[in-house]
């Protein structure tokens, strides 16, 4: 275990609440807390047992005045989150008592922790690897049960085990190649280029299985960025309100009511969906509305999915066709809204013929008709209908990139072997593939990148 100074930070959100928790970790953590703690009947923390709590008060050192009534818990390293001696002070929730206790801890020798420093210490002390550390922040930011379960599996080390299994297989190939090249006179089992290629193809299949689910994983982690577009007054804001079951967007009969972008998260069977309601796209002389239209177009560029809404009670016109042309390179669903106002089936069929889309849904948002069909369509477009909660899903873009680079190096090694170049040259590519996978667990990652990853964490974590 590495030696560090003693750090402290508030582990709960700032503001009023039932309790606040101040965390302190490091070799001197027990001594520091003991110096400002006064137990019932003047009992100190000198004899506190690990993994127990003690009731008492935190006092101001100089004045000896009581700051707050507290419960102190003690976790002895290495059996703690950071693998160091760690204490947590539970005080009354509120800004003043929390700040005063934190100030006393710092005055007594602790240093204010940097964002993510507690988790970083757990990583540096070998209690967790980097993929498990990143899973901690994914758990905190989870928006659905499914995204949380996926993050929990990663935190438990499921991804790490799979990555380490592949890396161990790679290192065995490298070791065998190097032994064959360096000690040709020894009685070693001969390793041929053909045998290495077979092993590498099996490794690539394993990597492919992880990569194939990574797009789904990105959505679980960040949410499916879904943008509702269409001309003014086709029902975009009504759709947003219906999906979130709340009157978030203003709905009127006046075209152009929505002039800015409205964003909300919804949960479709565990899949987090970021729904973006945009200003109606049309030619306008209104300066403010023009800005809204430009923002709408920017949001379309960023979208994973576009829901293109049309009004069934009106004929398709040039503006509709322009929007259709603008979104043609995106994944999109066409929503034919206001079914309740359309009585002409021939006109409805004409609409469908005009549209170049496999995914056309007829709705009446006003009557909540067609919304379940829309949700099923979204699931089928991105997740083939469902995601099983027990599946290992790569949710991190950094991990996805490392897997892709590792795969490319394996393919390069196969090409080298196919050209019948000396097998020891192929070992360079295999070692690169091994190194890229090590970036996922943090075994072969640059220290600056590690610092950047932990800087994205919140204070106290």
Curated annotation (Swiss-Prot):
Transmembrane segments: none annotated. Its cofactor is K(+). The keyword Magnesium applies. GO terms for biological process: tRNA methylation; tRNA wobble uridine modification. Homodimer. Heterotetramer of two MnmE and two MnmG subunits. Keywords: Cytoplasm, GTP-binding, Hydrolase, Magnesium, Metal-binding, Nucleotide-binding, Potassium, tRNA processing. It comes from Clostridium botulinum (strain Loch Maree / Type A3). GO terms for molecular function: GTP binding; GTPase activity; metal ion binding. The gene is mnmE. Binds 1 potassium ion per subunit. Belongs to the TRAFAC class TrmE-Era-EngA-EngB-Septin-like GTPase superfamily. TrmE GTPase family. GTP binds at residues 233-238, 252-258, 277-280. Residues 223-383 form the TrmE-type G domain. It comes from the Bacteria. InterPro entries: G_TrmE, GTP-bd, GTP-bd_TrmE_N, GTPase_MnmE, MnmE_dom2, MnmE_helical, P-loop_NTPase, Small_GTP-bd. PROSITE patterns: G_TRME (PS51709). This is tRNA modification GTPase MnmE. K(+) binds at residues 233, 252, 254, 257.
């Amino acid at each position: 275990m590495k030696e560090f100074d003693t750090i402290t930070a508030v582990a709960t959100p700032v503001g009023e609440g039932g309790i606040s928790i101040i965390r302190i970790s490091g070799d001197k953590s027990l001594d520091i807390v003991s110096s400002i703690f006064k137990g019932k009947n003047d009992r100190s923390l000198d004899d506190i047992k690990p993994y127990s709590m003690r009731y008492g008060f935190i006092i101001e050192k100089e004045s000896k005045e009581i700051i707050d009534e507290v419960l102190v818990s003690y976790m002895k390293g290495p059996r703690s989150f950071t693998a160091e001696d760690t204490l947590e002070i539970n005080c009354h929730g509120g800004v003043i008592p929390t700040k005063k206790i934190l100030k006393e801890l710092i005055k007594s020798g602790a240093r204010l922790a940097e964002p993510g420093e507690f988790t970083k210490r757990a990583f540096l002390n070998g209690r967790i690897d980097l993929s498990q550390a990143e899973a901690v922040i994914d758990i905190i930011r989870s928006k659905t049960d499914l995204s949380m379960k996926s993050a929990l599996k990663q935190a438990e080390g499921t991804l790490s085990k799979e990555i380490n299994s592949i890396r161990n297989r790679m290192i065995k190939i490298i070791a065998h190649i190097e032994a064959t090249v360096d000690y040709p006179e020894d009685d070693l089992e001969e390793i041929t280029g053909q045998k290495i290629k077979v092993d590498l193809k099996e490794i690539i299949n394993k990597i492919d299985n992880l990569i194939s689910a990574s797009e789904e994983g990105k959505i679980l982690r960040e949410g499916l960025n879904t943008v509702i577009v269409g001309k003014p007054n086709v029902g975009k804001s009504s759709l947003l309100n219906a999906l979130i079951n709340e009157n978030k967007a203003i709905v009127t009969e006046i075209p152009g009511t929505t002039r800015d972008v409205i964003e909300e998260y919804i949960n479709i069977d565990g899949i987090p969906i970021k729904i973006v309601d945009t200003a109606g796209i049309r030619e306008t002389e209104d300066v403010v509305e023009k800005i809204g239209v430009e923002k709408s177009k920017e949001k379309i560029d960023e979208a994973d999915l576009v829901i293109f809404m049309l009004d069934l009670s009106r004929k398709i016109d040039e503006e509709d066709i322009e929007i259709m042309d603008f979104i043609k390179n995106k994944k999109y669903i066409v929503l034919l809204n206001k079914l309740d106002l359309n009585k002409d089936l021939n006109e409805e069929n004409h609409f469908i013929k005009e549209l170049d889309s496999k995914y056309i849904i007829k709705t009446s948002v006003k009557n909540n008709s067609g919304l379940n069909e829309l949700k099923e369509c979204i699931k089928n477009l991105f997740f083939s209908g469902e995601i099983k909660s027990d599946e290992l899903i790569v949710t991190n873009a950094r991990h996805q990139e490392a897997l892709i680079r590792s795969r490319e190096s394996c393919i390069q090694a196969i090409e080298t072997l196919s050209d019948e170049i000396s097998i020891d040259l192929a070992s360079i590519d295999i070692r690169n593939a091994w190194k890229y996978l090590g970036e996922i667990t943090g075994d072969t990652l640059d220290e600056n990148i590690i610092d950047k990853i932990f800087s994205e964490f919140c204070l106290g974590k």
